[in-house]
Amino acid sequence: MADPKEVIKRLQQADSNLPVQVGREGAIIGEPTGYISTRCPTIDYLIGRPGVPLGGITLLVGAYGSGKSTIILNVLAEAQASGGQAVIFDTEGRLNFDRAQKLGVDLDNLIVAQPDTLEDTFDGVKAIINAAREALGEDDHIVIAIDSVAGAPMEKETKAVKMALGAQSVLIRRELRVLSNLVNRQRIALVITSQPRQRINLGAWGKPGTHWLGEDAIGHAAMTTILLEEQKQFGDDAASPIGHHIMATLIDTRIAGCTEPTCKECRRKDFRRTFDFYDATGPDFFSSALDVLQEKKAVTYKGGWYKFKEHKPFRRSDFEQKITEYPELLDTLRNILNGGHYD
């Protein structure tokens, strides 16, 4: 068999700019090099790994009030907590600095960009990636968030120039072809949000499916796509709810699922799980963690009581205290999230 390294050597001698390597040895990665938690165990569990991937794109889709921006801030705060660099492109001009600080974001070390157009957004992301990787170490975590891709108009729109049908999708598709490879080689987590769009469903019965700007282009480039939908509100006073339940649906993922060659039963699409979202603080970590532990049978439930191993049973409202008493609960949760959906 011919030596593939000899082919690489000849390419280098010819001054080729083509990124190429043999197998896993090189800058091109087939799998993420790490993960940044969303601080919502339910979402991490849906992803199948302990957070959004470093070296890939994550897409969060949801209407106004579905918690996308809060989850973005959680990811940025988590990246900073691990010593990484956080960057946010605020295309809608709705970044709330007080809320970001409340959720743990270090504003003194947060890079904020506010592009005027969609073209500026993508050009800025590419420039930030190159600048950040040059300024930071090779192993430093970098998380870039675009909130949202639907918030920035195209340059022609700002000048009231008539555009071709689907011009935004064409631009997004072209830019994502470049960005998906760039974030992969630079080990960067790129998180993008988008909003659902109405589509006329002529000649069909029932509720039309959910669609969003850049659906095909971003969906193809993303390692993980999650749809967030607001459900029933909760609170002691129905007239003044303090939060609502969020239904999270895993539309697609390329980083989790069954790896058994002969298995034909496991699915990695359309997983749906619900978590509590408080308007003041975002996803409730403790109830979300308990739900994941219960689903994986690490914690048993009977008659309103939860039980972990041989410890004394407890109520759901006592779980936050029990995590302090039983540190192994967090270790168990961490093992579940590292292992994905399957035992």
Q: How would you describe each model-predicted region?
A:
Residues 2-109, 121-127:
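The Walker A/P-loop phosphate-binding site
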Residues 57-59, 85, 141-143, 189-191:
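Residue-level preference for the first positions of well-ordered beta-strands
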Residues 97-98, 151-158, 200-202:
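Short acidic/His/Gly/Ser-rich catalytic and metal-binding motifs that mark active-site loops
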Residues 110-116:
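Short acidic-hydrophobic, aromatic-tinged amphipathic segments that line or gate anion-handling sites
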Residues 116-187:
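Phosphate-binding/switch loop-helix module in NTP-utilizing enzymes
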Residues 165-296:
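Phosphate-binding/switch region of NTP-binding enzymes
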Residues 284-314:
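Long, well-ordered amphipathic alpha-helical subdomains in the mid-to-C-terminal portions
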Residues 304-343:
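Terminal-proximal interaction/regulatory segments of ATP-powered molecular machines
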